[in-house]
């Protein structure tokens, strides 16, 4: 057996090993490969940048655990930006399987901001006291308070009917939030009674929820809307960008990495998150795949020519 035959018949487990190494190494030691920004992603960032303090933002988390690696870093980055800009954030989901994902992402972000606030107080030598709910007593506006600065409505069945209900009233459609507290008593809804009062709505989805939000939400109640989706479905939303029905779009892990880069560059966060690290691994694996395809095809052609066979292209 010739060298070329041996190479072409190599045990595929060696390839699996190379792919595993290409994934694990960048995750353990991020390469920080450059992330190129795209206009659709920048448009969402710029829109949030223009919103004055106290503006109302709704983020709908409409995806299941199968899309979590791509889309969860996206919503965490958006939450960080909204909180850094001191916007009033309402989040919800139309996907039953996404209820826990949205809560987890929101909890992570809120705890990060409030932990940083408490650390700043400790460094200044100032004492602080938490109430029985874990809320810091006497905190200023930089401390995030549930029901005032943010709220999580949770899941409600009905899809388009839920959106139409929100167009009439947030508190009537969701009488209680995800933790069971009455929404009518939450200060965040004092000036945000329905979808018409929104300054921005962003749908992060792995389903057809984006089209539904456009049809029954944006077009009826005239709020600005952006979207985030998995990479495989990003192209289907470009017509909505071209028509102006979407002001911006985050596509897959790349879109999440772009947003992480923008909030870091703007000084809202210290370092890139999971999406940027994931893009390192994804890029290396893609490069490795291309190299393997080129090498194997090259040796295949060499073997054919040495054997005197005609090669068809």
Language-model segment annotations:
Residues 6-30, 282-302:
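Hydrophobic alpha-helical transmembrane signal-anchor segments
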Residues 33-50:
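Alpha-helical transmembrane signal-anchor/signal-peptide segments
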Residues 45-73:
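Short extracytoplasmic
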Residues 56-65, 89-93, 201-202:
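Short glycine-rich or small-residue beta-strand-to-loop segments that form or flank ligand, phosphate
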Residues 66-151:
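Membrane-embedded segments
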Residues 147-236:
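Membrane-proximal low-complexity regions enriched in glycine and acidic/polar residues
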Residues 245-283:
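Short, aromatic-rich amphipathic segments at membrane interfaces
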Residues 306-313:
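Short, Lys/Arg-enriched, Gly/Pro-containing loop segments at transmembrane-helix junctions
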